[in-house]
Amino acid sequence: MKKFLNKIKSNKGNSLAEFAVTAAMMATLATTAAPRFSGVGEVGKQNQTMANLEKLGKMANQYYMDTSSPPTPNNPSGEGQGRIPGQERYDTQIGGYNRLTDVEAILNEQFNKWDDGEGGQWKSVFGLESANSSYVGEYQFTDESTDYGQGSGAYEWRLGLSAAEGPIKSPYQQGHYIYIVIPGGQQEIENPSTGESQLVECNECGPILVLADAYNPSKFYTVKSFN
């Protein structure tokens, strides 16, 4: 549990105490995003993909900060309320999960291969056109949108890249970066009597971003909270 919760990072500097309720609900989750591999080459790939996921998280944070500010000549992308690339608004869901506990089993060894059917609940970060064409036919995840402009995931993610950089690629041939967004505007709480979780309205609660490498999402993932 602690290993998973350590991956939930607030992009506003808030304490992880805010996630105490979530911690209780996810007490059965005991996975780690840093498996031990034999061989220097595999360790290098592991470290590289985790570094890439962290970079993607920072890109999302910068985008959230830019959109949260009012529009100005120096910040034309300002909207007055932050959102994650691909969201129409901060309370828009991306992918197939409406609450963080829905992801619990998925990140507990269930979704562990790029062609798993669970991938249908996820979206490509930079678009499938940037994926390894040898494996595109095996992927179950799809593009968030193929349009351009506000709310188009791949387009908005690419805004954080330099012209020379290009989409960030997984070091694994079968890998590809995917994501889901738990919508803001709500809070998941636990009923102390039943142990069941429920969603309540919370206007000040931001979205939660989960990024993963499709090579093995149960091992390579990161969680970012925008509360």
Show where each model-derived region lies.
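Intrinsically disordered, low-complexity regions enriched in Pro/Ser/Thr/Gly and acidic residues
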Residues: 101-227
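N-terminal signal-anchor/signal peptide hydrophobic helix marking the start
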Residues: 14-23
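N-terminal leader/signal peptides at the extreme start of proteins
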Residues: 1-12
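Alpha-helix exit/C-cap motif
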Residues: 58-90
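C-terminal juxtamembrane segment of a hydrophobic transmembrane alpha-helix
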Residues: 26-44, 64
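Residues within membrane-spanning alpha-helices of integral membrane proteins
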Residues: 24-25, 52
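Extracytoplasmic/periplasmic/luminal assembly and interaction segments
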Residues: 87-103
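Membrane-proximal amphipathic alpha-helices
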Residues: 42-53
